[in-house]
Each structure stands twice: as C-alpha cells, then as structure tokens.
C-alpha cells in the first residue's frame, strides 16, 4: 500500500514503484472522477506517456471538492493539496482493469469517457484503448444514450 502520510513523499513514490514493478499486475481496480480523472490524474495535466510509475501531484479545486462530495473529508480546507498517484501508464499496464463508476454525479464523466475523443481533457477516455477494461456503472451513472 502507498503511505499517503509518508514524511518523504518522493521516497514513498520510489518505494512503491519498486514494489509495483517487481511483478506483473494482474488486476487494477479503479474509478472515474466527476471530471473524468483516473486516480489523481486530473484533466488536462494527466500524461498518457508519463515515464513515472507513481508520483506526487497537486490536486485541483474540482478534485478536492469531489473528495468532500464523496465524504472522504468534511471540508475542502481539510483535503490535502497534494497526493500520491499511480500514473496513467502504470494503471494501463494491468492485465485487467475493473472500473467502478456509481452515482448520478458521475453520469457526465461516463458520457465523456465513452463518447469523447481520447485525450487528457477526459483522462478516463484512455481506458477505451485497453483490451481488458470492464466498466461497471449503475442506473444513475449510465448516460441516456449508452
């Protein structure tokens, strides 16, 4: 597990990268954020060709607000401004990707994931290029046209 409270985030990224790269990854479970982010790879700063495996990122206001909406924190002020995240290429390296996206607040993100051009405007759109990605949605998050 990544230690988000590590005293040295850069060293924690290196430690986890070594673990991650030690063996092939069979399954990666992930979600899609309200703005189309995957992990903390927010639009438009997500990098589909990122050379890193794990990195420190600055969380934008939309991502921080989602942490409150998801009841992870009581207020935006309590949400950290930075986080550790797997990069997009690291996630895409899994043999199977199981993506769970429940809730009406994710309907637009699911629409953009499935319908928009593949770009960092909706980082989750890259999931369409993975041959073994399964998207699990509920009635509330399913776009009408899907």
Which stretches of residues belong to each language-model region?
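Conserved phosphate- and dinucleotide-binding cores of soluble alpha/beta proteins
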Residues: 2-146
């Amino acid at each position: 597990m990544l230690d988000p409270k590590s005293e040295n985030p850069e060293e924690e990224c290196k430690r986890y990268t070594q673990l991650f790269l030690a063996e092939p990854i069979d399954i990666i479970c992930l979600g899609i954020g309200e703005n189309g982010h995957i992990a903390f790879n927010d639009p438009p700063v997500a990098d589909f060709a990122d050379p890193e495996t794990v990195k420190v990122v600055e969380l934008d206001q939309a991502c921080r607000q989602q942490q409150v909406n998801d009841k992870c924190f009581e207020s935006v002020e309590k949400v950290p401004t930075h986080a550790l995240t797997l990069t997009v290429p690291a996630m895409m390296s899994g043999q199977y990707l199981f993506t769970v996206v429940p809730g009406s607040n994710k309907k637009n993100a699911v629409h953009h994931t499935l319908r928009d051009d593949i770009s960092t405007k909706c980082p989750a759109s890259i999931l369409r290029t993975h041959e073994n990605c399964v998207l699990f949605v509920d009635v509330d998050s399913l776009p009408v046209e899907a």
